[in-house]
Design a protein with these regions (language model features):
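DNA replication initiation on ssDNA origins
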Residues: 1-128, 133, 139-143, 194, ...
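Aromatic/basic-lined ligand-recognition segments
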Residues: 78, 186-191, 210-213, 226-229
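Short beta-strand
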Residues: 120, 164-170, 229-232
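Histidine-centered divalent-metal-coordination microenvironment in nucleic-acid enzymes
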Residues: 128-131, 161-193, 237-243
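Long, well-ordered alpha-helical scaffolding segments within enzyme catalytic domains
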Residues: 140-162, 203-223
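Accessory DNA-engaging acidic/polar modules
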Residues: 190-206
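Acidic/polar low-complexity flexible segments
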Residues: 254, 271-274
């Protein structure tokens, strides 16, 4: 079978519905696009070849990046977005292009933003909270945990438009989002007694992580071993909804009400792998083997359900 790579990701990203929904969510936030190159002779057959950071203002940026990073059809790309909502001079916002060393890129990016924050050229306008739940050995348990967290959050967030959203990561777990800054501030006040609007970004991040832990404790009565707190760090990022997971070839998929009910019921749901679960959730087209998955010995098939992208419950960010 042909490979899922830049060309296939480009086809998905060039779809108008996909681009519009991604940019609605990512506008005013950090976007990180990473290109992965397949080198079968290397000890690590998959390595990042280029990393780009930017702030998204319109959909052509995303499509332009995918097009400009086009190389071998066996390469693939990933798209992450920041959990911070930022405001500042667009012309002065930092950008990094084609860094091969991910650590150097991360450190440089942090310094660029720190300088602008300290000088007052960029302001933190809000923060989304994300419960990132991974359980590669038991996707059903990962979903049950995510569903319990979302249920607990609805007890504390009254407005329907602020309700938690559950997203299948396309890989080994689920993300639970609280997007609205007012809802985040309310959770911080009511659960951990923190007035985050008056805090520095660093102290704010610490309060956010305490909220994450408190909700987990209330939802399932214990801490979660497979909970990743990285999205809630001061400059946290997470896979952008509707992006493609590079290792499985599956889409980061926001779950609508009907899909959530099907997963809760469990009838006809195949939890054996991310690919099988994706097939249970949404329509498929065009079977295509992922080169990264093939190298890792993992089943993978490309899916292309553009018609189901709109109105999936993920609100506009910002």
């Amino acid at each position: 079978m042909p490979a899922i790579g830049i060309l296939m990701v480009g086809r998905w990203m060039s779809n108008a519905a996909v681009r519009i929904e991604m940019v609605k969510m990512a506008k005013g936030r950090e976007i990180k696009v990473t290109r992965w190159r397949h080198d079968p002779l290397s000890d690590d057959p998959w390595r990042p070849y280029g990393v780009r950071h930017q702030i998204v203002e319109h959909s052509d940026i995303l499509l332009g990046w995918i097009s400009s990073m086009e190389s071998k059809p066996t390469d693939t790309v990933t798209v992450h977005m920041g959990t911070n909502l930022l405001e500042g001079d667009l012309d002065d916002r930092p950008r990094i292009v084609d860094q091969i060393n991910r650590k150097e890129c991360r450190d440089e990016w942090r310094q660029l933003w720190t300088d602008r924050f300290n000088e007052g050229r960029v302001s933190l306008m809000g923060k989304s909270l994300v419960w990132d739940i991974d359980d590669p050995d038991d996707l059903e348990t990962a979903f049950e945990t995510a569903d319990a967290i979302a249920s607990e959050l609805t007890k504390h967030v009254a407005m329907p438009e602020h309700a938690p959203r559950v997203v299948f990561s396309g890989g080994k777990g689920f993300h639970v989002w609280i997007v609205d800054e007012n809802a985040v501030q309310h959770l911080c006040r009511s659960l951990v007694g923190a007035e985050v609007s008056e805090m520095t970004a660093k102290k704010r991040a610490a309060a956010h992580r305490e909220v994450i832990k408190e909700i987990c404790q209330r939802a399932i009565g214990r801490s979660i071993h497979h909970l990743d707190q990285a999205p809630n760090h001061r400059q946290g990022i997470i896979r952008c909804p509707y992006a493609v997971h590079e290792r499985t070839g599956q889409i980061v998929w926001p779950l609508d009400v009907d899909e959530l009910e099907r997963l809760r019921d469990g009838d006809g749901i195949d939890w054996s792998s991310p690919v099988a679960l994706a097939k249970s959730i949404h329509p498929w087209e065009i079977p295509v083997q992922s080169p990264m998955a093939e190298a890792l010995g993992v089943e993978s098939t490309w899916i292309h359900p553009e018609a189901s992208v709109k109105d999936r419950g993920m609100p506009t960010y910002g």
